[in-house]
């Protein structure tokens, strides 16, 4: 796999994984209407549901607790680093805007 394809694939699988793990909301029953827009909406909804099901099956098949723990650790370390660098950047911007006293 190319280096460009790997992050894109990772992000798509991550988004689908979060969608699969999200809470299920009950769908409201609507009156069937034969309009074109409703048919398109139902078609897109069925495609989305099949993609979610496929992603859930793939996630369940390839779930590795060690990888999950590493990803959680990587996320916590990267957010800690980003908050540190954001604080430094904010201090620098404020000192530039405030000027010398």
Curated annotation (Swiss-Prot):
Function: Component of chylomicrons, very low-density lipoproteins (VLDL), low-density lipoproteins (LDL), and high-density lipoproteins (HDL) in plasma. Plays an important role in lipoprotein metabolism as an activator of lipoprotein lipase. Both proapolipoprotein C-II and apolipoprotein C-II can activate lipoprotein lipase. In normolipidemic individuals, it is mainly distributed in the HDL, whereas in hypertriglyceridemic individuals, predominantly found in the VLDL and LDL.
Disorder named in the UniProt entry: Hyperlipoproteinemia 1B: Autosomal recessive trait characterized by hypertriglyceridemia, xanthomas, and increased risk of pancreatitis and early atherosclerosis.
Keyword Ligase: no
Chief location of this protein within or outside the cell: secreted
Expression sites (tissue/organ): Liver and intestine.
CC terms in the record's Gene Ontology section: chylomicron; early endosome; extracellular region; extracellular space; intermediate-density lipoprotein particle; low-density lipoprotein particle; spherical high-density lipoprotein particle; very-low-density lipoprotein particle
Post-translational modification: Proapolipoprotein C-II is synthesized as a sialic acid containing glycoprotein which is subsequently desialylated prior to its proteolytic processing. Proapolipoprotein C-II, the major form found in plasma undergoes proteolytic cleavage of its N-terminal hexapeptide to generate apolipoprotein C-II, which occurs as the minor form in plasma.
Originating species: Homo sapiens (Human)
Region (O-glycosylated at one site): 23-38
Keyword 4Fe-4S found: no
UniProt-annotated location(s): Secreted
Recorded superkingdom: Eukaryota
Family: Belongs to the apolipoprotein C2 family.
Name of the protein: Apolipoprotein C-II
GO biological process: cholesterol efflux; cholesterol homeostasis; chylomicron remnant clearance; chylomicron remodeling; high-density lipoprotein particle clearance; lipid catabolic process; lipoprotein catabolic process; negative regulation of cholesterol transport
Pfam families the record matches: Apo-CII (PF05355)
Record's keyword terms, sorted: Chylomicron, Disease variant, Glycoprotein, HDL, Hyperlipidemia, LDL, Lipid degradation, Lipid metabolism, Lipid transport, Secreted, Sialic acid, Signal, Transport, VLDL
InterPro entries: Apo-CII, ApoC-II_dom_sf
Gene expressing this chain: APOC2
Highest classification ranks of the organism: Eukaryota, Metazoa, Chordata, Craniata, Vertebrata
Entry's Gene Ontology molecular function annotations: lipase inhibitor activity; lipid binding; lipoprotein lipase activator activity; molecular function activator activity; phospholipase activator activity; phospholipase binding
Positions of the UniProt region annotated as Lipid binding: 66-74
């Amino acid at each position: 796999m190319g280096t460009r394809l790997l992050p894109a694939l990772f992000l798509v699988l991550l988004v689908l994984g979060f969608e699969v793990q999200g809470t299920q909301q009950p769908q409201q029953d609507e009156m069937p209407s034969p309009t074109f827009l409703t048919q398109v909406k139902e078609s897109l909804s069925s495609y989305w549901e099949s993609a979610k099901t496929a992603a859930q099956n793939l996630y369940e098949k390839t779930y590795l607790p060690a990888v999950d723990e590493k990803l959680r650790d990587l996320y916590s370390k990267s957010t800690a680093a980003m908050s540190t660098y954001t604080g430094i950047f904010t201090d620098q911007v404020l000192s530039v805007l405030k000027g010398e006293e």
